[in-house]
Curated annotation (Swiss-Prot):
Name used for this protein in its record: Leucine aminopeptidase 3, chloroplastic
Gene designation per UniProt: LAP3
Organism: Arabidopsis thaliana (Mouse-ear cress)
List of residues binding Mn(2+) 1: K350, D355, D375, E437
Disulphide bonds in the chain: none
Source organism superkingdom: Eukaryota
Record text on subunit structure and interactions: Homohexamer (dimer of homotrimers).
Location(s) in or outside the cell: Plastid, Chloroplast
Chemical reaction(s) catalysed: Release of an N-terminal amino acid, Xaa-|-Yaa-, in which Xaa is preferably Leu, but may be other amino acids including Pro although not Arg or Lys, and Yaa may be Pro. Amino acid amides and methyl esters are also readily hydrolyzed, but rates on arylamides are exceedingly low; Release of N-terminal proline from a peptide
């Protein structure tokens, strides 16, 4: 029997075919840490080169700036299903077995003690035990070993390490990503997934783990090739879950995972899009398309600049004033097609399609001005959640998706350091930093959200570099005065596998935000900067509305992959789902 071995680190999404005598490659993942220097404040004047209207300038820019258009990409759908069969009976391209370190235990005769591995190894004539020993495969997270088995029902059998225990959503999502990587490497069209320790799982745990694996598989297959001249289409068509149960409950869990995953992909595509393609108008168009797609439950209201002026959104419009691309205020409303509405929620996202910093321009490589398309990340998460919710259609809950979309640019019409602006709730703000613009747009967005009569608001934004200093790149900061709302959102984040850490709302820090000429300044300095930013936002939320702020600046981008993460969608959708009846 000819057998070829493949080894990899799951997080790298790369598989290497090797002979038995080779050693597995050691590929480790790393996090990129942003080092934030003190802000350089540079102010200068720019003489306008033309006197035409912003609308005309927008048309010219959109027609000539790079002549770039995204390639049309259809995301292939994967068929997910469950079966209760013997693992040795399945026929297809890859049988992927998730194993913990405990599952890899062997007896005195070097045979597996785990029942599933023992049966599978006997079916393969002892090859599984031999290969795992030779390759020092122990079930550690990131380890993967794949055997080619021509002539048998499964063309390949893979062992994928889950670590000491498999109990977290992120562990099962990583398993799904490893399945996707193996499928891409071998051009497999059919995969079956089994957990070696599934017999110890409760029925609910089996359903949840299947959902997480499905999510990881969909996202692991995704590659954003819209701006590349060549791309490859994934070959994977079907994934069968063996030993996870069958019937409507499993089907519903798998469908939920699919809907959320495609919402995450939509978010990734928005954040990945360059600013010369994704303008505020295009972002608004994408939102309107969602309303059209889910017209039985969703409507769109896009406010233009004049309408925002009528609503006295001076804070938001001050940020937008310098750009040739006019602002577009996005408001999507989800209402169930039937039944009473018991709860009204709002999801508010920061929507800067590009942030130059304004007159306090971003200078130096540490401030990554070339990457400032990522400032659309909060709004992208909100719209990704809208897409998923349009598919899932949770009952009994009304959801408002709100984005104040604009660019923060530099021109003779732009806001200047020292300007005093007035938000739509009448609060005045001294602009002591034009690069602290996100909170200015969110201020009017939060006032608008409260005016919709909602019970709870969650806003999400790439708001401060200081949160990266505080928490690093693996989690987002969360701020709220409501313990109950904090519990709700933390529970949603834990179920989704997205890490949040509750930060203090230290009111004494408000002293840093006081102005001599206005009600407040918009930047209180770097010390406690993420906290003071949250305290600023709090001033624009009605006292009768529960509110929570997520600062996701460190989680929006994966520098190693040079791509957006899609962070926030899963947590927001889970939170909405938990508030439905």
């Amino acid at each position: 029997m000819a057998v070829t071995l493949v080894t990899s680190c799951a997080s790298s999404s790369r598989f290497h075919f090797r002979s038995f005598s080779s050693s597995p490659s050691s590929l480790s993942s790393c996090f990129v840490r942003f080092q934030l220097l003190s802000r350089l404040r540079v102010s200068f004047a720019i003489t306008p080169l033309y006197c035409s209207s912003k609308a005309t300038a927008h048309t010219i820019a959109h027609a000539t700036l790079g002549l770039t258009q995204a390639n049309s990409v259809d995301h292939p759908k994967i068929s997910f299903s469950g079966k209760e069969i013997d693992v040795t009976e399945w026929k297809g391209d890859i049988l992927a077995v998730g194993v913990t370190e405990k599952d890899m235990a062997k007896d005195a005769n070097s045979k597996f003690e785990n029942p599933i591995l023992k049966k599978l190894d006997a079916h393969l004539g002892g090859l599984l035990a031999d290969v795992s020993a030779e390759e020092d495969f122990s079930g550690k997270p990131g380890q993967s070993t794949v055997l080619r088995l021509p002539g048998l029902g499964s063309k390949r059998v893979g062992l994928i390490g889950l670590g000491k225990s498999a109990s977290t959503p992120s562990a099962f999502q990583s398993l799904g990503e490893a399945v996707a990587a193996a499928a891409k490497a071998s051009q497999a069209s059919s995969v079956a997934v089994v957990l070696a320790s599934s017999e110890s799982f409760s029925d609910e745990s089996k359903l949840s783990s299947a959902s997480d694996i499905a999510s990881g598989t969909v996202l692991g297959l995704f590659e954003d090739s819209r701006y590349k001249s060549e791309s490859k289409k994934p070959s994977l068509k079907s994934v069968v879950f063996i030993g996870f149960g069958t019937g409507p409950e499993l089907e519903n869990k798998l469908k939920y995972a699919e809907h959320v995953s495609y919402g995450v992909i939509f978010t990734k595509e928005l954040v990945n899009s360059p600013a010369n393609v994704l303008s505020p108008a295009v972002l608004a168009e994408e939102a309107s398309n969602l309303a059209s797609m889910y017209s039985n439950v969703m409507t769109a209201n896009i406010l233009k600049e004049e309408q925002c002026k009528e609503l006295k959104m001076g804070s938001y419009l001050a940020v937008a004033a310098a750009s040739a691309n006019p602002p577009h205020f996005i408001h999507l409303i989800y209402k169930p097609s039937s039944g009473p509405v018991k709860t009204k929620l709002a999801l508010v996202g920061k929507g800067l399609t590009f942030d130059s910093g304004g007159y306090n321009i971003k200078i130096g490589p540490e401030l990554i001005i070339e990457l400032m398309k990522i400032d659309v990340g909060g709004s992208a998460a909100v719209l990704g959640a809208a897409k998923a919710i349009g598919e899932i259609k949770p009952p009994g809950v009304e959801v408002h998706f709100i984005v104040a979309a604009c660019e923060n640019m530099i021109s003779g019409t732009g806001m200047r350091p020292g300007d005093v602006i007035t938000a739509s709730n009448g609060k005045t703000i001294e602009v002591n930093d034009t690069d602290s613009e996100g909170r200015l747009t969110l201020a009017d967005a939060l006032v608008y959200a409260c005016n919709q009569g909602v019970d709870k608001i969650v806003d999400i934004a790439t708001l401060t570099g200081e949160i990266i200093v505080a928490l690093g790149p693996s989690m987002a900061g969360m701020y709220t005065a409501s313990d109950e709302l904090a519990k709700e959102v933390i529970a949603a984040s834990q179920r989704s596998g997205e890490k949040l850490w509750r930060m203090p709302m230290e009111e004494s820090y408000w002293e840093m935000m006081k102005s001599g000429v206005a009600d407040m300044v918009n930047f209180g300095g770097r010390a406690g900067g993420s906290i003071t930013a949250a305290l600023f936002l709090k001033r624009f939320v009605s006292e009768n509305v529960e509110w929570l702020h997520i600062d996701m600046a460190g989680r929006v981008w994966n520098e190693k992959k040079k791509a957006a993460t899609g962070f926030g969608v899963a947590t927001l959708v889970e939170w909405v789902q938990n508030n439905s009846s």
